[in-house]
Amino acid sequence: FLYHLLVMALAPEVWAPHYWFVLMTIALSYPLNPNDVTKKKYYDLIHNIPLLLPVEKLGNDFSNLLDEYPVTPYLDSRDSFIKWTHFIHNKVNQSLDKPEIDFYTALDKYYFHYKPKEIINQDNIRFREKVLFVAIILLTSGLIVYLYKK
């Protein structure tokens, strides 16, 4: 078992979505009006991310993004830090040839994870009922037209 852990590469497809979820959680819980100590701690956290990524190349790429798009000007407010986090996520997606996602869609996807499973199941059932209803209406209408023209 230990051998497999040492040999197996940690696939970004597995850990990266969780990583981005945690980063967005950190940004969304950032103080509205942070003081200098808080700004410094968050600055340090963001600048330590490249060291914490399990794939060295991705860590180096993230470090380059931090050089190109520094976080410092965006640590003055929660809003700007959230937008910077989203912007950086899109920059990483660009570099990986993944589609960019607009800000509000990203927030919707984030908050979807907090939706209780019972509500998700109810929403799915309601959607299926609507699809079934529309299908029945279309079939009935088609049958009426067919019989009328006959």
Where is each model-derived feature located?
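Terminal, compositionally biased segments used for targeting/anchoring and flexible tails
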Residues: 4-150
